[in-house]
Amino acid sequence: MTEQIDRYVSFRNVEWERRTAEVFALLQPHFDGSTSPFWDYFLRQRVIAHAQGLDDLRVLHNFLPTLKDLLEELDDERTLSRLEELEVLCM
């Protein structure tokens, strides 16, 4: 029997760190090849968040609507799907 995941009780068995790292890895080509000023801003905010002791899950959460809109515009279904999965399980 598969153990049920209840994000409101615990992140146990959710593997949020791995999932978050996967989303950032999928975002990397957008960081590297984009002319959009958003990506530079996003990465600067990530550095600030890390300096404040916040993790990448929080960074994604802070920019969730914008990220989803951009990924839709870029037709990046794979990254959008992983981001939405992370949203459902962990945010």
UniProtKB/Swiss-Prot annotation:
* Superkingdom of this protein's organism: Bacteria
Q: Which GO biological process annotations does it have?
A: nitrogen fixation
Which regions span the lipid bilayer? Answer: none
Keyword Nucleus appears in the UniProt entry: no
| Keyword list, A-Z | Nitrogen fixation
A UniProt-annotated Pfam family: CowN
Q: What does the sequence similarity comment in the record state about its family?
A: Belongs to the CowN family.
The UniProt function text for this chain reads: Is required to sustain N(2)-dependent growth in the presence of low levels of carbon monoxide (CO). Probably acts by protecting the N(2) fixation ability of the nitrogenase complex, which is inactivated in the presence of CO.
What NCBIfam families is this protein classified in? N2Fix_CO_CowN (NF033689)
Cited HAMAP family: CowN (MF_02117)
Q: What is this protein called?
A: N(2)-fixation sustaining protein CowN
Species of origin: Gluconacetobacter diazotrophicus (strain ATCC 49037 / DSM 5601 / CCUG 37298 / CIP 103539 / LMG 7603 / PAl5)
Q: Which lineage ranks, top first, belong to the organism behind this chain?
A: Bacteria, Pseudomonadati, Pseudomonadota, Alphaproteobacteria, Acetobacterales
